[in-house]
């Protein structure tokens, strides 16, 4: 099993040290090709790594603020794009066709049912004009939409709004997220990588540069329905357990999928926490 080989190479040499120190969270700064690999999906022969430890990926910006925030009930700004779109821009190397996302509206409705202080914007209401100025008012910004990494030009990688507009990584760096704890990109492709893997943390870096403490993104295209299950579990845990860190809530949500019929790492391991989820 490749995941077990990588565990033996990366974790086994320090496993006893982690146990002796009673480590609860692995703060991970992957380099080059290791950025392709979700640490959660490594296996010790009995358990997945995420079943033993929380995982927090970091960028250089993460190192400037690793303080833990006081626990409080979250406020969420949630936007979703459920419609199919074709994106064409002069500065993009090609056009991109996106299928409908059948489960995202249900995902947002479930989040709002658990966290009443949630503002929901769907399709034509989910525009940059309606969304970007409001983000700084919320602790969590959640986008259930398509994203695309543009190979060779990662600064033009983008997420799709519900009216067909896009926000590139450059645009994200100008967002005002100083009071935002977490930006969740619950989308089909928000952290796909190429080359040395520099793009994967480029997203987290852009979100943090704009002021947010952390981001959650995905390493590969994820099934729409399993994403809904994981994300609603994540928010339920955060809402019902205010003492949970972001890293712990994501860990428990991933474990819930491990214990379900969607237990293959394809479904739960690509979700990465980038930044400060402590």
Where are these regions (language model features)?
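Active-site-proximal beta-strand/loop segments in catalytic clefts of secreted hydrolases
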Residues: 29-32, 53, 79-83, 124-125, ...
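Charged, well-ordered internal alpha-helical segments
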Residues: 1-77, 103-114, 126-147, 155-156
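Short acidic loop-to-helix transition motifs that present clustered carboxylates
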Residues: 122-130, 166-167
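Second-shell loop/turn segments in exported
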Residues: 1, 94-101, 121, 190-193
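Catalytic cores of nucleophile-dependent amide-cleaving enzymes
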Residues: 139-229, 233
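An often Trp-containing, charged/polar helix-loop segment at the C-terminal end
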Residues: 226-278
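Short helix-loop-beta junction
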Residues: 102-119, 206-215
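Short glycine-rich His-centered loop
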Residues: 72-100
């Amino acid at each position: 099993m490749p995941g077990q080989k990588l565990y033996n190479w990366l974790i086994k040499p320090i496993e006893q040290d982690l146990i002796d120190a009673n480590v609860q969270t692995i703060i991970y700064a992957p380099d080059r090709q290791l950025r392709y690999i979700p640490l959660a999906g490594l296996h010790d022969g009995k358990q997945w790594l995420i079943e033993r430890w929380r995982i927090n990926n970091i960028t250089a910006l993460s190192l400037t603020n690793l303080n833990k925030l006081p626990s409080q009930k979250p406020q969420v700004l949630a936007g979703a794009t459920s419609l199919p779109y074709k994106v064409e821009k002069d500065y993009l190397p090609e056009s991109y066709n996106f299928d409908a996302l059948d489960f995202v509206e249900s995902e947002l409705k479930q989040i709002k049912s658990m966290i009443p202080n949630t503002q929901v914007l769907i399709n034509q209401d989910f525009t940059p004009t309606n969304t970007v100025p409001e983000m700084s008012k919320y602790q969590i910004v959640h986008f259930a939409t398509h994203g695309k990494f543009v190979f060779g030009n990662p600064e033009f990688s983008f997420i799709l709004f519900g009216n067909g507009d896009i926000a590139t990584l450059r645009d994200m760096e100008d967002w005002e997220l100083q009071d935002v704890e977490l930006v969740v990109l619950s989308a089909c492709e928000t952290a796909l990588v190429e080359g040395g893997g520099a793009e994967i943390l480029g997203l987290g870096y852009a979100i943090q540069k704009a002021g947010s403490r952390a981001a959650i993104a995905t390493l590969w295209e994820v099934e729409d329905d399993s994403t809904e299950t994981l994300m609603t579990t994540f928010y339920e845990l955060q809402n019902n357990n205010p003492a949970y860190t972001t890293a712990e809530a994501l860990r428990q949500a991933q474990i819930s999928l491990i214990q379900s019929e969607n237990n293959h790492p394809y479904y739960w391991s690509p979700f990465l926490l980038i930044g400060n989820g402590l």
